[in-house]
């Protein structure tokens, strides 16, 4: 992998790996090698959830568990992680197999999100919980400053349903129109038909549920509720 690209990535991350093999593994998709990033992703997912939960607990001392859970879900969901990945220009650093390269895997939201979690796991193993917590909070500083409790933090499907019910309109319908990839690494494409929109909106995700949420979010944007 190009050392110039790797050094630039580490500057953007705000962390230089002592063990570069952990960074290489974090950037390696299972399509490229048997030594891939899924175990690091598993670890990073749990660490991220803890760090964000801890930050919200101390920032919002009077907010109940339900609102904190919704805020955490907003901050750790796939599209938020993919946004962070794009800020780091992570796509050009990924190690992907030929099939994923050809199909544009370096742009795929689920792969970008998973890689951010793998990087978190890698930083933890390369250093300690204090370092990785500091790093995550630096990545999330603006988002933590901007987030607030309330209905805005309900998931998109719930908000879309409540909007339509409040206007006595039919509930949205979700249809799977495409499933790509192998069983362990699928991408679902969903069409969501919403009363008031002339065409179905499209959402993609690594599971049917995530794709439906993505479609609902697009519908909310078209309805100018997002």
Curated annotation (Swiss-Prot):
TM spans (from-to): none
Catalysis performed (reactions): Endonucleolytic cleavage to 5'-phosphomonoester
Key words of the record: Cytoplasm, Endonuclease, Hydrolase, Magnesium, Metal-binding, mRNA processing, Nuclease, RNA-binding, rRNA processing, rRNA-binding, tRNA processing
Chief localisation class: cytoplasm
GO biological process: mRNA processing; regulation of gene expression; rRNA processing; tRNA processing
Record domain DRBM: where: 155-225
UniProt KW Nuclease keyword: yes
Any one Gene Ontology cellular component term annotated for this protein: cytoplasm
CDD domains cross-referenced by the UniProt entry: DSRM_RNAse_III_family, RIBOc
Binding sites annotated in the UniProt record for Mg(2+): 41, 114, 117
Active site: 45, 117
Domain RNase III: 6-128
Pfam family, one: dsrm
Molecular function via GO: double-stranded RNA binding; metal ion binding; ribonuclease III activity; rRNA binding
Obligatory cofactor(s): Mg(2+)
Top enzyme class: hydrolase
SMART domains according to UniProt: DSRM (SM00358), RIBOc (SM00535)
Cellular localization per UniProt: Cytoplasm
E.C. number(s) listed in UniProt: 3.1.26.3
Described purpose of this protein according to its UniProt entry: Digests double-stranded RNA. Involved in the processing of primary rRNA transcript to yield the immediate precursors to the large and small rRNAs (23S and 16S). Processes some mRNAs, and tRNAs when they are encoded in the rRNA operon. Processes pre-crRNA and tracrRNA of type II CRISPR loci if present in the organism.
UniProt similarity note: Belongs to the ribonuclease III family.
NCBIfam families per the UniProt record, alphabetical: RNaseIII
Oligomer and partners: Homodimer.
Name the UniProt record assigns to this protein: Ribonuclease 3
Organism (species): Klebsiella pneumoniae subsp. pneumoniae (strain ATCC 700721 / MGH 78578)
Gene behind this protein: rnc
């Amino acid at each position: 992998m190009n050392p110039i690209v790797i050094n630039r990535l580490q500057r953007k991350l705000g962390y230089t790996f002592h063990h570069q093999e952990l960074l290489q593994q974090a950037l390696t998709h299972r399509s490229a090698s048997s030594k891939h990033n899924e175990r690091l992703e598993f670890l990073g997912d749990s660490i991220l959830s803890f760090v964000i939960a801890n930050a919200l607990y101390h920032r919002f001392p009077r907010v109940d568990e339900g609102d904190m859970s919704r805020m955490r879900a907003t901050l750790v969901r796939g599209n938020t992680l993919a946004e962070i990945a794009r800020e780091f220009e992570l796509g050009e650093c990924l190690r992907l197999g030929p099939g994923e390269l050809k199909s544009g895997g370096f742009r795929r939201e689920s792969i970008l999100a998973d890689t951010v979690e793998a990087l978190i796991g890698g930083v933890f193993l390369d250093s300690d919980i204090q370092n990785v917590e500091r790093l995550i909070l630096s990545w999330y500083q603006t988002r933590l400053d901007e987030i607030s409790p309330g209905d805005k933090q309900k998931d998109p499907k719930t908000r879309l349903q409540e909007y339509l019910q409040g206007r006595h309109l039919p509930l949205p319908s979700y249809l799977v129109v495409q499933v790509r990839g192998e069983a362990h690494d699928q991408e679902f494409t969903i069409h969501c038909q919403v009363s008031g929109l002339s065409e179905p909106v499209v959402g993609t995700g690594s599971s049917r549920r995530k794709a439906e949420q993505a479609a609902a979010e697009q519908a909310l944007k078209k309805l100018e509720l997002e």
